[in-house]
Amino acid sequence: MKHLTQNKTVIDWIEEKIALVSPDEVMWIDGSEEQLDALRTKACETGEMTKLNEDLLPGCLLHRTKPNDVARVENRTFICAESADQAGPTNNWMDPAEAYKMLYDIARDSYKGRTMYIIPYSMGPVGSPFSKIGVELTDSIYVVLNMAIMTRVGKKVMDTLGDSNDWVRGLHCSCDIDPEKRYICQFPQDNTIISVNSAYGGNVLLGKKCFALRIASYQGWKEGWQAEHMLILGLENPKGEVKYICAAFPSACGKTNLAMLIPPEGYRNKGYKIWCVGDDISWIRKGPDGRLYAINPENGFFGVAPGTNEKSNPNALAATRKNTIFTNVALNLDNNTVWWEGLDKNPPENAIDWQGRPWNGKTSEEKGAHPNSRFTAPAVNCPCISSEFENPAGVPISAIVFGGRRAKLAPLVYQSRSWNHGVFVGSIMASETTAAAAGAVGVVRRDPMAMLPFCGYNMADYWQHWIDIGAGLDEDKAPKIFNVNWFRKDDDGNFLWPGFGDNMRVLEWIIKRCEGKVDADETAIGFVPKAEDINLEGIEDEVSEDQLKEILSVDNSLWEDEAKGIEEFYAKFGDRLPKALSDELNTLKANLEK
């Protein structure tokens, strides 16, 4: 067999895995359009994919996974570090030797009658100093075609790797899609990922969460950079100056919507624009000028389809109009297009649902699309994609924003007093599960820096790494750190802030703070805007001045309860908890007593 590379470490590993899984055929993915086209045709012939309407959705395909294989599985995801302590209390741990044995037993001969596809891919622009290379072996054309959208694939990647051994090994085996034998295992010390018995996106597109967050966060810890679950956006002012923001939110907090925000009309008329560099993952390093720079290591968007529409996110919708793969959405048989809940108010009557069954959207009680159905769309399709998207040096970060969903606790926005205080703010990030009763507070789920399911090593060490990164930055060069909460409610359970495009008003205040152009009020938790500094032009009818004051208010008694919750959470980490964070918690408590 002719390999696409002379790299001995790559060839040896592939030969070893061929012997393990016994494929009938082996195919290197060279990245050429001809080869990808042939694979699309083959997938449609075998029924693995369905070709959609060429006039309305050119180059688009539909795929359905098995009904028992529709989401990431956190309880089947393991960090196989040398000790349980290295994985930490927030991760599932498995002994590496035991894990390899178990996984190899499951994988053995699982490619019989199948083709092995070898996908060389780059996370980040090929050749960028930020970028890292991986090789994924898979028996799924669906995986190949998704990876060709989500990453940079092909021969140029292997040429860039040369003889280096700095690459991430990834083995994916669909096996029988048996949920009892489904495992997604990361081996940080070995730069290795093994995924078995799944064919769903996040579990099998190994460049995404497995590599770009779990493995890369560990690499960043060892190499002095950061892999973060953050969007990157550029805010352009009327003078044409662009400032960049990284932002981390737990799921269901509107990350993709914020990354592709369309400013309110008043802002657009003045010449404000938002540019999307990335909607999910940031790799961050210190640049030659002492500032932090970020790249989006991905090459596409793997977005949740339900709820995406012309109003909530027109840019994301536009990105899906060509060369996109849809997973587990409904198929409209009348015009061979796709539909999902929240797309419009007009569900098709003659359709096939996500499970492949006839479906009438007007009469059915069941959903046509799975709630976690997805689109995989090329980044270049997005109308607001940043001109810096391919910049190998990344973009300079002015602000880091954390956020969550809190009905009463956090104000609309506040700024940390310092870098370490900002790390504290990120470490206590949480969302309340939405409660049915109006105004009732849901269960608080801590999700530090939105990395709870994605941190590849002990979370306490991860926080210390944040503190160390900050210690290496000059204060005037370090990004300012903020927390936002679009989800504050009144006593009747109504949202107090309109959200969506109007979040631009908060981003504007954040940038003004970074530029030293506005003052703020100091509270027990940090700096909160003066009400007059949040621009309400055009939404005066929706947000009264009293309402704005309510959204910006800090209730110390609620924060006293919160401090107890933080203390309980921190206790999980024992003496590994960075002293800087326990100091910040003590400062918060002291401030609340004043």
Regions found by a protein language model. Give the residues of each.
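Conserved internal helical-beta-strand scaffold that buttresses enzyme catalytic cores
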Residues: K2-C253, P263-K594
